[in-house]
Structures are given as structure tokens and as C-alpha cells.
Amino acid sequence: MTTGPFVPNPTIDPKSLGKVGVLMGGRSAEREISLMSGNGVLAALRARGVDAHAFDPGLQAVADLAKQGFDRVVISLHGRFGEDGTIQGLLEQFGIPYTGSGVLASALAMDKEATKRQWQTHGLPTPDFVMLHAGADWQAVADRLGLPLIVKPAREGSSIGLTKVTSVAELPAAYEKAARLDRDVMAEQFIEGDELTCPIIGEGESATALPLIRIVAPQANYDYQNKYFTDDTRYECPAPIPADVAARVQALVVQAYRGLGCRGWGRADIMLRKSDNAPFLLEMNTSPGMTGHSLVPMGARAAGISYEDFVLQLAASASLELHASTDWKPE
């Protein structure tokens, strides 16, 4: 596994990428952020001379990508219908290369329960959790996980629907809030310590962890508002932690990325326990944000990679997982 410096390919000819679609918007609760990410990516590609065009699958049929002659797409969609394997499956059907993880890895990473169970199978550390339902024994949940704990939808991103619960009495309302967004709701053990995130690029043995970022949010509340719409959240990159701890976290992140079968790029969220510097994996994002507040560009800059260089490299990495045979004939 690789945690060393990543050097972008300086020989990419923008014209060789053909007509590039930047998928943005979509139909998820993260539409607004997706539009911000997509417009940043679009501007970067055009600045490098790429024939790039915006495409909103929330307003246009994905089949139009093939009809309009797109050679590849950069996925700047976040959340459902863009980060969960659905759009990836359609692009495989139409034979249009795309950035990021394939169908299965995208679906796994979008589902927090599936992600955690996969990591547990690989022996990777992740906080204990319980799946909730309306008739749950709230006291039993608190007894198992301890307080405070986190309640969140199993298939949303950007901390949408997330609540930090400090008493048993708060659990029913936290569950209802999350259940309005997803039928599957998770209660997760709260790990006290530093909140870290780590961008990853590449695939398989070539997967590379970029510098870690420590997130210091107001009142330690890194919610949707503090992620995207405030300047009060502080980001420290590289994270000010001991070098040996940082290397251990980066190695763990690469294992987590590979364990889900991710490719192209991603970003792992981690808690570093205060008592002993033990890392715990929280989530894997397979289509991370690329806004002015986003963390992947920050990690890339710390590694000496400009926003435009990163986006150009990302567009060049577009590929298909499946290669349909043209020789098959029915018997």
C-alpha cells in the first residue's frame, strides 16, 4: 500500500480527453453542494483547455450523454443517485467512462452499515453501532454504545440528518429526524478525540493517501452548516499529530479504501481517540466535495498538487469496470 507523495501525470493532453461531461446537481439532498463542486470542476477543466460541459442528471436523461457524444464524464454528484452505484451502473450500460469507484464499491460506501460490516470483515477498526427502528429499546441502545452517541441516516452524506445525542430522552427525536431521510437509521458509538479526514487517489496497490487534515469545528459540531457555509471551522493540513501516528492512520485509510474496492479517488473520515491515539474509521466518500471549503483539494495542495492539476488527472482517470463483448450471439 502506498502513502508516499503523488506526482500527477504532466503529459496529459487536454484534447485527448475528448468531450467531457461534468455531472452535477442530481436529485439528492446534497444537490446544492454538488452544483458548487461541479461548477468548480467545470471551470478547472475549461481553464486547462478541456472541452467540458455541465450535465445535470436531475434535469436531463442520462441517455442524452450518449446521444450528445460525450467521451467521458467526471462525476461531481453527491449522495443518492450519484454516489451510490446507480449512475455508475447506467454509465456502464451506455459505455461511457466515468471517474471514481464502480457500481459495487459506490453502493457499499454509500451504505454506512454495509461499509462498517465490510471493514469489520477485514479486521479494521470502526466504532460500534446499532441499527435503529421505531420500537427500539432506547435504554438498551445507550447501554451498549454509551453516551454521548451519534444517530444518522445510513445513506446520506454531508452530516445531513445527523444528531449527537447526550441523553436517552433525546434518542426518539434523533431517530425520527434521521428516519425522515432514510428508512435505515444507525446509532454509532461516539469516539472522543480529533476528527480527521484523508483523501486517497489511485487504485489497488497504487492507491495513495494524501496528507491528513484535522477538522476543528465550532463546539466540535461539524454539521452541514459548518461544513459548507461558515468560515468558523478550522482545517489544519497537514494534521498536527505525531508523524508515526499520521503514517499509521494513512496506512489504515488505504486498507479501508482497498477493502471496499474503491478506485479513482475518495476520502475517508476518521476519529483519533484522545486517550490512546487509536484511529477509528467512520465513513468512505467515493465522490467527495470539490467546493471552496472541500477537503480533497486542501489535501492535494498540501501534497503540491494544484486544484486544476488534480481535476485534470481525475478526468484522465475515467474508465469502465465492465467491457461488454461485441462477439456474443444468442444460441
Swiss-Prot record:
EC number of this enzyme: 6.3.2.4
Chloroplast keyword on record: no
Pfam families found in the cross-reference section: Dala_Dala_lig_C, Dala_Dala_lig_N
The protein's annotated pathway: Cell wall biogenesis; peptidoglycan biosynthesis
Recorded GO MF terms: ATP binding; D-alanine-D-alanine ligase activity; metal ion binding
Binding site for ATP: 142-197
Cofactor, how bound (note): Binds 2 magnesium or manganese ions per subunit.
Domain of life: Bacteria
Record's subcellular location: Cytoplasm
Reported cofactor(s): Mg(2+); Mn(2+)
InterPro entries: ATP-grasp, ATP_grasp_subdomain_1, D-Ala_lig_Van_CS, D_ala_D_ala, Dala_Dala_lig_C, Dala_Dala_lig_N, PreATP-grasp_dom_sf
UniProt record similarity statement: Belongs to the D-alanine--D-alanine ligase family.
Task of the protein: Cell wall formation.
Name of the protein in its database record: D-alanine--D-alanine ligase
